[in-house]
């Protein structure tokens, strides 16, 4: 549980913060809920049951990631408002066009991938397992993936530390992410 994901955004009064709850079984998230109190939007998923969005007390809407027709004209990438943009752009191949979408909360950025509003969220910097467990369930149930930047799945309660490695949230796994994000094998 993370009662305040996006603490700096909360302090700055940007509205880009969330409350996160996850259930992890056998080192893998099986349930996730993300609530944005300012927008009133809730995202949730349960393993095998799909991913859903409740926009401001309305009816639940099933969500899914965006799939591209190749060649794609542009890749939308959610980025942190607080991160050095050059650190991100150095990782991007010049062969593609990008729309960078700044946002605060890590959970809300991952949920944008889950609902197909952006294609990717690249996180280079410290986060805890509590920042990704709920959104991993939501993203996976929506058809996406959350992987380390070495392209291995994130795991929970298996390391000596609860800190995550750098990671990427991918909507369309069929895109050539090794090329797009200049990932070295």
Regions found by a protein language model. Give the residues of each.
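Short helix-loop capping/hinge motifs at secondary-structure junctions, enriched
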Residues: 50-53, 58-60, 174-179
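Oxyanion/phosphate-interacting regions
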Residues: 90-94, 109-185
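Short loop->beta-strand "edge-of-pocket" segments that line small-molecule binding or catalytic clefts
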Residues: 66-87, 94-104
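DPxDG-like acidic metal-binding loop motif
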Residues: 1-52
């Amino acid at each position: 549980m993370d009662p305040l994901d996006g603490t700096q955004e909360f302090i700055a009064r940007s509205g880009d913060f969330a409350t996160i709850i996850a259930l992890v079984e056998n080192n893998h998230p099986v349930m996730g809920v993300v609530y944005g109190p300012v927008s009133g939007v809730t995202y949730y998923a349960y393993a095998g049951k799909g991913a859903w969005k409740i926009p401001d007390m309305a009816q639940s809407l099933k969500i899914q990631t965006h799939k591209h027709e190749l060649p794609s004209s542009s890749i939308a990438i959610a980025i942190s408002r607080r991160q050095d943009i050059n650190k991100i752009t150095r990782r991007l191949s010049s062969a593609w066009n990008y729309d960078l979408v700044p946002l605060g909360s890590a959970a809300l950025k991952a949920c944008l991938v889950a609902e197909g509003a952006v294609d990717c969220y690249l996180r280079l910097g410290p986060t805890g397992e509590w920042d990704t467990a709920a959104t991993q369930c939501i993203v996976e149930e929506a058809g996406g993936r959350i992987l380390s930047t070495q392209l291995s799945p994130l795991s929970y309660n298996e390391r000596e530390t609860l800190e995550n490695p750098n990671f990427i949230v991918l909507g369309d796994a069929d895109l050539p992410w090794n090329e797009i994000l200049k990932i070295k094998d």
